[in-house]
């Protein structure tokens, strides 16, 4: 009897197997765009239809094609016929665990638990996505928080922008990434394990390998001091040539790009000669720096909107910064944009990045206005935040344009961003991977 029951059960399962094996119906979404900037750098292509299957663009057609006429009767239709539609934006320099710097954030760094910082990071990620930035490159935090957030987003456990993450940034002892700067010697080990600090080529090779072992997507280093470094050591070179070369060579062994925090020209030149992929901030660029950018093909990420964060923090609390840091803040505000004015006409490759965490998360698009103020056309600024930033991140096959095969990450605005980049501050619609995240278009 038992054998008979088992036989019947196996027969029933076998009969059901084809049904169980059937793939789910594809999810089709059709977007009708009033004006489509599918490939920034080119003119808008006018009224268009974007066909999306399971989160990927499969087709772009001229005109507003009905779902049935497109061969997808019953598909979801998103009506953006009164909007400019363009690819999701890319911010290539954010710090999702951080908020505007100052005395408070210094205290929070040692008071907040990693769990509390993780919730902050998730909230900041959602603000960023809501602002139309569907991809970000996170350039430094501690405790592996953004690495975990990156993985959670990729697995679909939480909603946020796609994240490319550098883990913990590397510098020398007493360099910009030394988290215990400004604290007593006896507190240094209690505050941080300092495994992101290296002195000498061999130590720097090991430090890179530690970051790779933790699963980072790229390496971030500092070759100069930083504005928010809690010492008055200036913004010049703080790493030797052989240390920078050792870092780049080791990163290359593992197929990792290298992004470099550098303000002073000496640190910029050191990094470019070492073969890095991008310079972040690049506040002072002399003629030799610009020639090296052109020669090496490295990217320049100017992070102009940090000045907004500084100005807002000072307005809220004139004593937010120590005298040593305030002097650097005032200098950064004074010279911001001067290097971009020189770099753009010379053909230096520029990618969009804000340093959000110094400036406010969710206001990433403020950078566009400053890029235009300091020498870029609206079209160039938009390319920097789409095609160019995607290339810098190694994601040209996934992001930056709306073409068949790429992720269906798109945004919509009222008004032409090629005439007025400030419309990008008011994104009314955000879709990531074919799923609507934000829709405030009204009736």
Residue ranges of each PLM-predicted region?
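Bacterial N-terminal signal peptides
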Residues: 7-16
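Histidine-rich, glycine-flanked metal-binding segment
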Residues: 23-27, 36, 40-86
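Metal-associated gating/positioning segment near the N- to mid-region
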Residues: 83-157, 173-178, 242, 266, ...
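Active-site gating loops and adjacent loop-to-helix segments of metal-dependent hydrolytic enzymes
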Residues: 97-117, 173-193, 227-240, 296-333
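Histidine/acidic-residue-rich catalytic or RNA/ligand-binding cores of hydrolases
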Residues: 100-104, 146, 175-176, 229-231, ...
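His/Asp/Glu-enriched, well-ordered alpha-helical/loop segment
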Residues: 109, 253, 257, 321-324, ...
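Divalent metal-dependent hydrolysis catalytic cores, especially in the metallo-beta-lactamase
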Residues: 120-146, 160-169, 216-229, 257, ...
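Alpha-helix-loop-beta-strand connector modules within alpha/beta enzyme cores
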Residues: 151-169, 235-260, 301-305
């Amino acid at each position: 009897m038992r054998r008979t029951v088992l036989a019947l059960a196996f027969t029933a399962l076998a009969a059901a197997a084809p049904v169980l094996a059937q793939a789910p119906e594809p999810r089709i979404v059709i977007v009708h765009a009033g004006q489509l900037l599918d490939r920034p750098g080119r003119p808008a292509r006018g009224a268009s239809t974007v066909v999306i299957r399971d989160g990927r663009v499969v087709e772009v057609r001229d005109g507003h094609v009905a779902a049935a006429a497109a061969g997808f009767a019953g598909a979801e239709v998103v009506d953006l016929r009164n909007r400019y539609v363009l690819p999701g934006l890319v911010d290539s320099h954010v710090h999702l665990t951080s908020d505007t710097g100052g005395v408070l954030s210094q205290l929070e760094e040692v008071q907040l638990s990693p769990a509390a910082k993780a919730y902050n990071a998730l909230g900041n990620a959602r603000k960023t996505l809501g602002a139309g930035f569907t991809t970000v490159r996170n350039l430094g935090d501690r405790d592996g928080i953004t690495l975990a957030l990156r993985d959670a987003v990729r697995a679909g456990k939480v909603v946020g922008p796609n994240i490319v993450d550098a883990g913990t940034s590397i510098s020398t002892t007493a360099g910009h990434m030394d988290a215990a700067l400004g604290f007593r010697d006896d507190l240094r080990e209690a505050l941080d394990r300092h495994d992101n600090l290296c002195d000498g080529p061999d130590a720097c090779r090991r430090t890179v390998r530690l970051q790779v072992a933790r699963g980072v997507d790229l390496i971030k280093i500092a070759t100069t001091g930083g504005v928010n470094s809690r010492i008055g050591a200036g913004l010049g070179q703080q790493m030797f040539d052989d240390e920078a070369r050792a870092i780049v060579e080791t990163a290359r062994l593992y197929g990792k790009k290298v992004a470099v925090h550098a303000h002073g020209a000496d640190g910029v030149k050191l990094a470019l000669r070492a073969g890095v992929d991008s310079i972040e901030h690049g506040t002072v660029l002399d003629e030799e720096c610009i020639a090296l950018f052109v020669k090496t093909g490295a990217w320049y990420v100017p992070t102009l909107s940090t000045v907004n964060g500084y100005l807002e923090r000072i307005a809220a609390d004139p004593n937010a910064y120590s005298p040593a840091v305030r002097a650097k803040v005032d200098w950064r505000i004074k010279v911001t944009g001067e290097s971009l004015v020189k770099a753009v006409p010379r053909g230096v490759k520029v990618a969009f990045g804000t340093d959000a965490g110094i400036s406010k998360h969710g206001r990433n698009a403020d950078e566009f206005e400053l890029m235009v103020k300091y020498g870029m056309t609206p079209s160039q600024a938009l390319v920097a935040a789409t095609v160019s930033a995607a290339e810098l991140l190694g994601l040209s096959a996934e992001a930056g344009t709306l073409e068949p095969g790429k992720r269906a990450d798109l945004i919509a605005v009222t008004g032409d961003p090629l005439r007025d980049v400030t419309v990008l501050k008011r994104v009314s619609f955000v879709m990531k991977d074919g799923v609507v995240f934000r829709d405030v278009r009204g009736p």
